[in-house]
C-alpha cells in the first residue's frame, strides 16, 4: 500500500510539473508566428532584358574605362578612400551611379569592381567609396549618420567632370538599401534608385522570416523552428542592436524617382515577393509606377555558382547589361509607360515564409531575462555542489571529534539529487550544443541528418525523464513511509533546496527552447 501511495504521489507530481511547464511554455510564446507566404507573383517572361521605347542605349563594352583612387572627407574630418571608374572617351556629360555597401563589405577595393567597371564601359561614371567603419560595428549602426556620409560621396560624384548632376543615382545592396532609402527620402533630386536584395522591412521582422526559412530548408525540428518568435520578440538592448528596429518602411513612401528592384530567387533570407509588392504598393500610392522588378536564378548577391554568398562567384551574365540599359534609359527620360519590356520579369520567385506584421514579446521580455534564467540553473547547481562538499567535510570533522549529532539525507535521496543535478546540467549542455550545430548547419544550408533529427527526440525524452526524476525526488522528501525526516541538518536542507531550484531553473530554460515540442 505504501509503495502504491508513493507511486501515486510521484505520478501526481509528474503530471503537475509537466502541466506547469507546458503552461509556462505557452506563456513564453508571443502572439505571432512566421507563416508560409502565399501571395505569389507571376512573372510574364523569363527574359530579364530591359529596353526603352525611346530608343537603344549604350551597350556594355562601348567605352574604355579609366580608374582613379580619390579621398573623400566625411563629418568629423574622417577621410575615406574611394574609386572612380569612368568612360575615358565620353564626349559631353552622362549619368553616374554611387554604390552603397551592404553588410559584410567595407573596402572600395574589394567590392563592386566588376559591376562598376561594366557600368563605366557603358558610359556611366561610378563611384565606390569605402564604408566608414569607425562608427559601424556588429552591435551598433547609425543609418542616418551613414546616409549623411554617403551624401558627401554623392556630392563629390555630382561635381565630377563628365557627369550630369541631374542624372546621378544610387545602387545599393541588402542593408545598404536602408541607407539609400534615407537618402532618396531627403534628396528628391537623386535621379534613380537601384535596390538589390533589399530587406524592405525592419531588420527584426525580416530576420524572423529569414531564420525560419533557413531552418525549414535544413529540416530543423519543429521545436527549434518555433523558438524564433520568442527570440525575435525580445528586447536586445543588452547587446545594443538598436538598428534591428530601424523604421525602414516610411522612407519607401518617398521613392518618387525611377526605381529598379533586383532579387535572386535562390535567396531565402530576403522577402523576394512580399518585399517587392510592398515597394510597388507604396510607390504606386504616391503616383510613381516607374518601378522595374527583375528576378534572377541567383543568390543574395545576384551571383551564380552557390546559393550562399561566397567570394569570387561570377555575376549573373545578364545582370550588368540590364543595369546599364535601365540606367541609360532612365537618363534618356523613360517614363513608366515608355518601357518596351515588362516591368516584372525573370525567373519565377517562390518566397517560403512571410515577414510578420509585428514582433511582440512573450513572458521572457528581454535577452537579459533569458540569460539570467539560463545562467541561474547552473549557478544554483554549482552552489549546491559546494554546499554538499562543505557538508561532507563538516560531517567528517564531527565524526573525528566528540560531536555525534546526526545529519544527512535519507537512503536513496543522495543518489537522486546527484542524478537530478547531473541530468539537468547535461541536458542544458546538450541542448546548447544541439542549437549551435543547427545554427551552423542552417548558415551553410546543409540539411540535418536523420540522426540529428532523432537527437532532438532523444533530448525531449530525457527532459521527460528529468521531470520524472524531479517528481521522484519530491516523493522521497515529502512522502516517506517510515515517518522519519528525509533531510537532517540546515546544510543538507540548503543543498536540497539549491539542487531543486537549480534543476527547475534549467527545466524552465529547456522549456523556453521548446524541448518538449517533438
What kind of region is each of these model predictions?
Residues 288, 297-301, 305-422, 428-518:
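Alpha/beta-hydrolase-fold serine-hydrolase catalytic core, especially in secreted/extracellular enzymes
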Amino acid at each position: 500500500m505504501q509503495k502504491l501511495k508513493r507511486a501515486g504521489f510521484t505520478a501526481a507530481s509528474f503530471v503537475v510539473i509537466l502541466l506547469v511547464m507546458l503552461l509556462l511554455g505557452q506563456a513564453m510564446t508571443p502572439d505571432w508566428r512566421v507563416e508560409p507566404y502565399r501571395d505569389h507573383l507571376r512573372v510574364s517572361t523569363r527574359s530579364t532584358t530591359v529596353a526603352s521605347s525611346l530608343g537603344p542605349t549604350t551597350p556594355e563594352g562601348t567605352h574604355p574605362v579609366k580608374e582613379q583612387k580619390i579621398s573623400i572627407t566625411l563629418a568629423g574630418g574622417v577621410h575615406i578612400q574611394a574609386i572612380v571608374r569612368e568612360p575615358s572617351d565620353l564626349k559631353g556629360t552622362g549619368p553616374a551611379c554611387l554604390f552603397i555597401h551592404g553588410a559584410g563589405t567595407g573596402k572600395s577595393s574589394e567590392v563592386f569592381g566588376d559591376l562598376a567597371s561594366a557600368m563605366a564601359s557603358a558610359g556611366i561614371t561610378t563611384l565606390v567609396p569605402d564604408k566608414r567603419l569607425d562608427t559601424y560595428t556588429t552591435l551598433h549602426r547609425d543609418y542616418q549618420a551613414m546616409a549623411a556620409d554617403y551624401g558627401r560621396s554623392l556630392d563629390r560624384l555630382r561635381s565630377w567632370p563628365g557627369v550630369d548632376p541631374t542624372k546621378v543615382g544610387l545602387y545599393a545592396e541588402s542593408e545598404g538599401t536602408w541607407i539609400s532609402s534615407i537618402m532618396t527620402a531627403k534628396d528628391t533630386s537623386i535621379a534613380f534608385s537601384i535596390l538589390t536584395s533589399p530587406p524592405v522591412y525592419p531588420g527584426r521582422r525580416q530576420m524572423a522570416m529569414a531564420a525560419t526559412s533557413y531552418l525549414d530548408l535544413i529540416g530543423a525540428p519543429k521545436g527549434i523552428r518555433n523558438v524564433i518568435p520568442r527570440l525575435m520578440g525580445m528586447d536586445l538592448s543588452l547587446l545594443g542592436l538598436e538598428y534591428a528596429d530601424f523604421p525602414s518602411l516610411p522612407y519607401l513612401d518617398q521613392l518618387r524617382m525611377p526605381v529598379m528592384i533586383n532579387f535572386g530567387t535562390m535567396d531565402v533570407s530576403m522577402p523576394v515577393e512580399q518585399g517587392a509588392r510592398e515597394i510597388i504598393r507604396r510607390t504606386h500610392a504616391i503616383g510613381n509606377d516607374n518601378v522595374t522588378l527583375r528576378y534572377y536564378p541567383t543568390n543574395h548577391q545576384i551571383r551564380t555558382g552557390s546559393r550562399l554568398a561566397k567570394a569570387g562567384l561570377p555575376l549573373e551574365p545578364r545582370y550588368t547589361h540590364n543595369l546599364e540599359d535601365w540606367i541609360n534609359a532612365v537618363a534618356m527620360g523613360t517614363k513608366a509607360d515608355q518601357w518596351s519590356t515588362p516591368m516584372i520579369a525573370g525567373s519565377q520567385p517562390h518566397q517560403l515564409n512571410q515577414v510578420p506584421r509585428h514582433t511582440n514579446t512573450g513572458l521572457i521580455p528581454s535577452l537579459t531575462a533569458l540569460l539570467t534564467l539560463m545562467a541561474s540553473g547552473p549557478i544554483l547547481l554549482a552552489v549546491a555542489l559546494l554546499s554538499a562538499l562543505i557538508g561532507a567535510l563538516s560531517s567528517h570533522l564531527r565524526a573525528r571529534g566528540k560531536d555525534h549529532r546526526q545529519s544527512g539525507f535519507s537512503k536513496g535521496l543522495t543518489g537522486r539529487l546527484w542524478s537530478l543535478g547531473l541530468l539537468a546540467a547535461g541536458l542544458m549542455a546538450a541542448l546548447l550544443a544541439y542549437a549551435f550545430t543547427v545554427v551552423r548547419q542552417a548558415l551553410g544550408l546543409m540539411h540535418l541528418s536523420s540522426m540529428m533529427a532523432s537527437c532532438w527526440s532523444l533530448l525531449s525524452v530525457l527532459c521527460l525523464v528529468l521531470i520524472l526524476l524531479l517528481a521522484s525526488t519530491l516523493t522521497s522528501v515529502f512522502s516517506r513511509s517510515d515517518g522519519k525526516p528525509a533531510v537532517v541538518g540546515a546544510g543538507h536542507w540548503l543543498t536540497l533546496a539549491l539542487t531543486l531550484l537549480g534543476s527547475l531553473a534549467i527545466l524552465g530554460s529547456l522549456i523556453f527552447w521548446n524541448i518538449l515540442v517533438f
